[in-house]
A protein has these predicted regions:
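Zn2+-dependent metallopeptidase catalytic domains
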Residues: 19-204
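Gram-negative bacterial Sec-dependent N-terminal signal peptides
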Residues: 2-20
């Protein structure tokens, strides 16, 4: 009886493993191989988009933490370039989701937009209002002459520095909290306006 139970348990475990292995992989985590890098939209579900967005957020958070916790002198390469080129998965997922959230939007995609909009707003504020991160950016900005940057690199540095300032990096804690609240409200209003506009456009 013990042997029968053992083999039954082993068979069940193998079956469960087989089911897990058969679960379709998220297409957003693989390279798009179609011509011109077109996404395989027919294979991507709303759950895939949600999973991709959340993973992309976590990856970018890890990149930001690595910059902040680095003991190296802030430079264009280890700070500005990482900020400029980081968040690759998040950009890919949001860029792929974009067309589906406009003309071909469904109730599911609209619901995902509403779910993620305040999360994206908070994520952006967490980056651009982060005092420790801005200190690294400012250190590169204030000492840019010694880095012998190219014209393009200077432009990237200026744009990123301005983005931090425009997004509230120089505000005090109370002002930042108020701006965060306004940003969240604005993101939801912009989303609602966009969804209403799409709805009316599709009716005509």
């Amino acid at each position: 009886m013990k042997f029968k139970n053992y083999f039954f348990a082993a068979a069940m475990a193998a079956a469960l493993c087989g089911c897990a292995e058969q679960k379709p992989a998220n297409p957003l985590f693989s390279d798009f191989t179609a011509p011109f890098g077109i996404a395989p939209f027919e294979e991507i579900t709303v759950d895939h988009f949600r999973e991709g967005m959340l993973k992309g957020l976590e990856e970018q958070k890890a990149e930001i933490e690595a910059i902040i916790n680095s003991t190296e002198e802030p430079t264009f390469e280890n700070t500005i370039k990482v900020l400029d080129q980081g968040g690759e998965l998040l950009r890919k997922v949001r860029g792929t989701f974009g067309p589906l959230s406009s003309g071909s939007a469904t109730d599911e995609t609209r619901a995902l937009q509403k779910e993620m909009s305040p999360i994206f707003s908070a994520h952006s504020d967490d980056i651009y209002m982060n005092q420790a991160l801005f200190a690294k950016v400012k250190a590169v900005y204030d000492n840019k002459a010694k880095f012998n940057l190219t014209k393009e690199e200077n432009t990237v540095l200026q744009n990123i520095y301005d983005r931090f300032v425009d997004s509230g990096a120089l505000l005090n804690d109370e002002q930042k909290a108020e701006l965060r609240k306004l940003n969240t409200e604005l993101s939801m209003l912009q989303l609602q306006f966009g969804q209403n506009l799409t709805h009316e456009t599709n009716k005509t």
